[in-house]
Amino acid sequence: MLINCKVGDKFIYHAGKLLSKHGYFHAEDLKLKCHVVEILDDAIILESNCSKKNRYYMTEETKELYEKEEN
C-alpha cells in the first residue's frame, strides 16, 4: 500500500511540480483538489473535484506530488 487512505479521502495534487520539471515553469504553483475513488495494489486512483472526467494515478514514483487534506 502506498499510503494509508480510504475511498473518499481528499488530496491536493501539486500538478505544477510535475509540469515545471518538463519546462512549464509558469504552471509551477498549479494545485488541483481531488478525492480517492479506488485503491489498487500498486496505485491509488483519484478523481478531480471539479471534473468527473479527470483522473489521476498516484504511484510510488508520483506520491510526493500529493498532499492529504486534513478534515
Question: What is each residue range found by the language model?
Answer:
Residues 1, 10, 37, 57-60:
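A detector of low-complexity, intrinsically disordered, Ser/Thr/Gly/Pro/Ala-rich segments
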Residues 1-7, 14-19:
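Mixed-charge, Lys/Arg-rich low-complexity intrinsically disordered regions
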Residues 6-9, 43:
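Surface-exposed loop/turn positions
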Residues 9-12, 22, 54-55, 64:
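Intrinsically disordered, low-complexity segments enriched in small/polar residues
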Residues 16-18, 29-30, 61-62, 71:
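Short linear sequence elements within intrinsically disordered, low-complexity coil regions
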Residues 20-56:
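Basic/aromatic-rich interaction segments and small domains that mediate binding to polyanionic partners
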Residues 47-71:
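Intrinsically disordered, low-complexity, charged/polar segments
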